[in-house]
């Protein structure tokens, strides 16, 4: 059984658990989890836990929450520190969603409002310290299994930065300079940030985090 089928089968098994008296904690999932692009405000109630968005994501960015996440289990989310959202053309995850949990009005990057990035430890930032990207620092990214040309392109973009002063967060951002730039040897998050999480994924010291369901104005 491959990874995606395992996830979906697990979600089905979890759903069955409701019928046998499993007590699940309530959570504020809308505040805790980074959802795929196009997620509506009442995402948790509309998501039918079908896993279609997981199956079609070419970057393998989307997973399903497990039973430890309470009533949110089986719903789709993105762990940006493992794999951000690369904001694909046509948003296949949105097109695959049958329930309206991901709004089909999401057609261009400007429609996406997943959250906003924050720098949590400037002193550990490689750019701030004037340090180069090392092969060991991005080993986890380069060792990741590749399934398609898009993922290979990401790996190649990371590999060419080895030996250069780190600007991975800015150079790999799918939004571009309207979202993040390096200014004064530090990442500067700008109003164009949509919270895709790519900067968090590729940051070697993991000092960028995503605040889900918040806007730039709410954070900055």
Describe the residue ranges of each PLM region.
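Non-ligating segments of multi-cofactor redox enzymes
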Residues: 1-220
């Amino acid at each position: 059984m491959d990874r995606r089928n395992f996830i979906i089968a697990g979600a089905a098994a979890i759903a069955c658990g409701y019928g046998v008296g499993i007590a699940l904690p309530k959570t504020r999932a809308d505040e805790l989890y980074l959802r795929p692009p196009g997620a509506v405000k009442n995402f948790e109630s509309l998501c039918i836990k079908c896993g279609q968005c997981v199956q079609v994501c070419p970057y393998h960015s989307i997973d399903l929450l497990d039973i430890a996440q309470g009533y949110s289990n089986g719903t789709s989310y993105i762990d940006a520190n493992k794999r951000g959202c690369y904001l694909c053309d046509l948003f296949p995850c949105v097109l695959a969603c049958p329930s309206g949990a991901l709004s089909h009005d999401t057609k261009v990057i400007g429609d996406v409002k997943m959250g906003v990035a924050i720098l949590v430890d400037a002193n550990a930032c490689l750019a701030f310290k004037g340090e180069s990207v090392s092969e060991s620092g991005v080993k986890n990214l380069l060792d990741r299994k590749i399934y398609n040309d898009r993922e290979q392109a990401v790996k190649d973009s990371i590999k060419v930065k080895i030996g250069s002063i780190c600007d991975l967060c800015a150079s790999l951002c799918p939004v571009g300079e309207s979202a993040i730039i390096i200014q004064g040897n530090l990442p500067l998050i700008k109003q164009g940030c949509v919270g895709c999480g790519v900067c968090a994924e590729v940051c070697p010291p993991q000092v960028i985090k995503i605040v889900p369901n918040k806007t730039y104005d709410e954070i900055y």
